Amino acid sequence: MSKQYETVIGLEVHVELATKTKIFCACSTEFGGAPNTHTCPVCTGMPGSLPVLNKQVMEYALAVGLAVNCQINQYCKFDRKNYFYPDNPQNYQISQLYLPICHDGHVEIDTPAGKKKIGIHEIHMEEDAGKLIHDEWEDCSLVDYNRSGVPLIEIVSEPDMRSGDEVIAYLEKLRLIIQYLGASDCKLQEGSMRADVNLSVREAGSSELGTRTEMKNLNSFKAIARAIEGERKRQIELIEEGKPVVQETRRWDDNKESSYAMRSKEDARDYRYFPDPDLPPVVISDEWIGNIKSRQPELRTEKMARYQEEFNLSEYDADIITGSKHMADIFEAVTAICGKAKEAANWLMVEAMRLLKEHDMDPEEMTFSAENLAKLIHLVDNGTINRTVGKEVFEKIFAENIDPEQYVEEKGLRVVNDEEELRRVIEGIVSANPQSVEDYHSGKEKAFGFLVGQTMRSMKGKADPGAVNRILKELLG
């Protein structure tokens, strides 16, 4: 009988903070600038340059720590993590090892077995490295230091997760908390949220941890789930074959759905940490912590409760809408403009979610304006267009953020209410479908629906459904 194994997973989640300037200098953190245009002597490691801590980085780190139930180190320090790599111009990274800003927190996730608490070992602040570019020249790599010195927090979990599903639930919970705080946009595709997966397997029932590996290059939740499954199987196969699992860092190739070894996995002592002599310790007062708490924005749980109370949404609807901060922001903006909360929720939950699924997009990637969705709701509500045409218009809003009023006029999509025209078209449909007329008179209600559908198709969806039903019933007798 084959052995049963348990997967043990911990995560190191790196989050780029939404500050306008870097952690230790005044250079811009804007994404996508020309290479090496957001740099200065500090973030490129020039001799004699001195770092100055960005206060906003501290405030974001504290806000995240408080939101995930952490204890705050009211006396924290920065340390130097020493290593040599081309994208690290100082040959060390300023981080926190001995006294990180936050420790001993947790978040709760939903699992099939119920609520599960995932421990957070610590949160520390650090600076990001530069970026190596390998595809510009054949015989060398280039370095872009725009990212060097961009502020990060690293959220280190306890090894409390046991499956890919639990990992994704944890990451989604973290992402929502951080987005609602405004601390980061957490866009995996742009690298503002990155997760390294530490994974080991052991025999079910054992309390002894196996040898862990670290998985890198994971830029989507789907890639993370696939990497976990692939690494779990790889380690089990090694154990079954009597081979050792090597403690190493591995790079995931999502196209090949496999990983390869990058280097042996380092321990803290390999980096020869020591206190940074250029940065004084930071003392965090009770007053400062209280001020952060008092300014903390509405998080998802409170927003859900408010939507049910203020907008009379069901718990299910409120849960779906608040599942993305961007979608919740659009919902509130649309509702503020048109005053129709349930209609706004319906368009977002049904049509927007359908298109997101079709295009394999995250809600954060939606670019249409709240004003245009509010205009569409008004056009449908006042009968200018029917809902069928409204869906067509929404697809254009979703894809191109078009002005729906202008689009409806240009394409001639207004509802046809002219009784004579409707009667003429319906008479033609009735004459062309004698079998359906006979079926209707023999009690087959589906035949009526067929005739309505033929009428709407003939009029390209622009007919008033109520008028079509009324006139058709008159003609059928």
What residue ranges belong to the model's regions?
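Amphipathic alpha-helical core segments of compact helical bundles
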Residues: 18, 198, 202, 233, ...
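Core structural elements
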Residues: 190-203, 308-330, 341-358, 371-373, ...
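Short, amphipathic C-terminal "tail helix"
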Residues: 445-477
